Amino acid sequence: MKKLLVASSASAALFAVGVGANAHAAEDNNVNQDQLAQTALNNTQQLNDAPVQEGAYNIAFDNSGYNFNFNSDGTNWSWSYNADSSAQQAPAQSTTQEQAPAAQQAPAQSTTQEQAPAAQQAPAQEQTQQPAQQPAQQQTQQPAQQSADSGSNVQVNDHLKAIAQRESGGDIHAINSSSGAAGKYQFLQTTWDSVAPAEYQGKPASEAPEAVQDAAAQKLYDTAGPSQWVTA
C-alpha cells in the first residue's frame, strides 16, 4: 500500500524518535552501570518516572546477565533490557516515556511488567516474517517464556491501534509485496528510517520488535499526523 513520506533527519532519530549522535556521548559512558542495572531490575518505576539524566543520551551495556539500553533525545526517553547469551530465556522488558522540559518531569505514561527475581536467561532471537499474528496482550508478572519481539509496553493512542488493525491486522512481521511496506503499521522504508532507532534503520520495520514499531509509529503520528496512513 502506498504511503506518504515525511522529510526528516535520520541522524536525529531515536527509540521513540530514533537514536542519533549527540553532544552527550562522552557523558553517557560515565554512568554507574552497576547502579543503573540494579535500578532497571528492581526499581522500574524510578526509570518510568524520570530519565537517567538530563539531555540526550544513548547508553548500552551488559551487566548481571542482561543487555541494557537507555536512550533519550532530551524530550522522550526509553529503556529496555533482555537476557544475554549465557542463560535461559525469560520475558524481556522495556518502556518508553516522555521527558518534561527543563528540571520538571512529566508523570509516567505507561506501565511495565514487574521483573521476577534474577534468573538465568538466554537472548531473544530476532525473527523474520512470520504468518499473521494477533497483538500480544500486556500481562502482569509471569514466569512463562516468550520472545523479545512479542508484546509491547509502549502505549499508542486508540487511533493508531485502529490504523494497525486496518494496515496489517496487528501482524508485526507483515510485508506488502507490492509496495514493500512492512511491519505492524506498514512503514515504507524511507519513512521507517526517519523515525526508527539507528540499529533498525536500513532494515524493514517487520524485523524490529513490536515495542520499537509502536514507539516509531506514535512518534510519526505526533510529528506528522495520521495523514501518513491512507487507511487513517
Curated annotation (Swiss-Prot):
Signal peptide region: 1-25
Superkingdom of origin organism: Bacteria
GO cellular component terms listed in the entry, alphabetical order: extracellular region
Keyword Secreted: yes
Keyword annotations of the record: Glycosidase, Hydrolase, Secreted, Signal
A GO term, aspect molecular function: hydrolase activity, acting on glycosyl bonds
Protein's cellular compartments: Secreted
Region (Disordered): 84-154
InterPro entries: Lysozyme-like_dom_sf (IPR023346), RPF (IPR010618)
Chief place of localization: secreted
Disulfide bonds listed in the record: none
Function: Is able to cleave peptidoglycan and affects clumping and separation of bacterial cells.
Family affiliation: Belongs to the transglycosylase family. SceD subfamily.
Protein name (record): Probable transglycosylase SceD
Protein's organism: Staphylococcus carnosus (strain TM300)
